[in-house]
């Protein structure tokens, strides 16, 4: 049975198109870890109120949005040209929020020192930050996800499964199996947060958890 499941999973693997985001949602990682190939969309125009520059965590008061302010000259600015507004001390605020949310989680101390340097340096471009985040999370999970980048933008694609919609949390209806969260005794299980929530609570068991899901 296990061999059949493994074979069936390989046969169903997809070539996917997806956005690089800031500490991606769990659904993002379900899509990527289950993919045959991953291509990141980098030729799009920037859109506000998406996960390109935000993540959601589980704070003592429930769900919390962590947003990075960005600078853009027009509504048609390419995302790869979007600069971070470093006048706002987002690094300090985000790190303190992560500490308040996860310092009592099982794996916070194990991973936080590897993540800390990210919040101690200033990045110029949002896209560069997102790719550094991607590599950091992969290292923490103990996985490697090879990827390519787009060279031009297409509104519709026929040769890949288009998961770009996942960048918009309002359009992402993914439901995942509950796992233990720090404050679930107060607020219950909160679905599909940042991959950091799964990492701090499940450690490298998170990889097995992700592989139990598919989109």
Language-model region placement:
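Residues lining hydrophobic/aromatic ligand-binding pockets adjacent to catalytic sites
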Residues: 2-215
């Amino acid at each position: 049975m296990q061999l059949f499941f493994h074979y069936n999973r390989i046969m169903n693997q997809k070539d996917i198109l997806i956005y690089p985001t800031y500490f991606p949602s769990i659904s993002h990682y379900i899509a990527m870890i289950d993919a045959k190939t991953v291509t990141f969309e980098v030729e799009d125009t920037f859109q506000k109120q998406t996960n390109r520059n935000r993540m959601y965590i589980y704070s003592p008061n429930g769900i919390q949005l962590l947003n990075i302010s960005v600078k853009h000259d027009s509504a048609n600015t390419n995302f790869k040209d979007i600069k971070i507004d470093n006048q706002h001390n987002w690094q300090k605020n985000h790190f303190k929020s992560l500490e308040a949310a996860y310092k009592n989680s099982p794996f916070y101390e194990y991973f936080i020192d590897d993540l800390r340097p990210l919040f101690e340096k200033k990045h110029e471009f949002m896209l560069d930050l997102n790719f550094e985040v991607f590599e950091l999370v992969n290292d923490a999970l103990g996985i490697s996800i090879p990827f390519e980048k787009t060279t031009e933008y297409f509104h519709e694609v026929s040769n890949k499964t288009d998961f770009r919609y996942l960048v918009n949390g309002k359009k992402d209806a993914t439901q995942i199996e509950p796992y233990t969260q720090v404050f679930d005794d107060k607020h219950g299980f909160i679905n599909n947060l940042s991959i950091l929530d799964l990492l701090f609570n499940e450690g490298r068991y998170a990889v097995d958890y992700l592989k139990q899901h598919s989109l």
